[in-house]
Amino acid sequence: MITLNQIKDRKARGSKKKRKTLLTGYPQKKGFCVKVYVTKPKKPNSAIRKVAKVTIRLKNKRKNLIAYIPGFGPHNLQPLSTVLIKGGRCQDLPGVKYRLVRKHYDFQIAERFPRKNRRSKFSVKNEKLKAKKGTAVRIG
């Protein structure tokens, strides 16, 4: 049987605190690059991944975070470039919980090949629609 002293000394079970991300309440956030560099992924994978250290402003505070630079080939980012950040971690890079959105602010990049699949992830327009708009016939 449990005694009163044991009841008194027992710790109360508290509810688990949820971690807040830096983008809580915002779908995207504007920031600027502090450092652009490459890093290597965790154990079974092997590559050179491009990442950027970005500073964002939250209620008169400045917070630093690490964001993944998506896409193939070279990019035009350098320190003090303005970028748009969205959530989404990179699974094989520890500490990288955010991604940069292409074709916004200073992160303008043109790929060297026509992208036909997953265009919305990389902000690429549909080439078929471009061709149709160029050959529109006017009646009247």
From Swiss-Prot:
GO terms for cellular component: mitochondrion; small ribosomal subunit. The keyword Repressor does not apply. The keyword Transcription regulation does not apply. It is found in: Mitochondrion. SUPFAM superfamilies: Nucleic acid-binding proteins. One of its GO terms (biological process) is translation. Its main location: mitochondrion. It holds the Pfam family Ribosom_S12_S23. Keywords: Mitochondrion, Ribonucleoprotein, Ribosomal protein. One of its GO terms (molecular function) is structural constituent of ribosome. Belongs to the universal ribosomal protein uS12 family. PANTHER family: 30S RIBOSOMAL PROTEIN S12 FAMILY MEMBER (PTHR11652). NCBIfam families: rpsL_bact. This is Small ribosomal subunit protein uS12m. It comes from Dictyostelium citrinum (Slime mold). The lineage of its organism: Eukaryota, Amoebozoa, Evosea, Eumycetozoa, Dictyostelia.
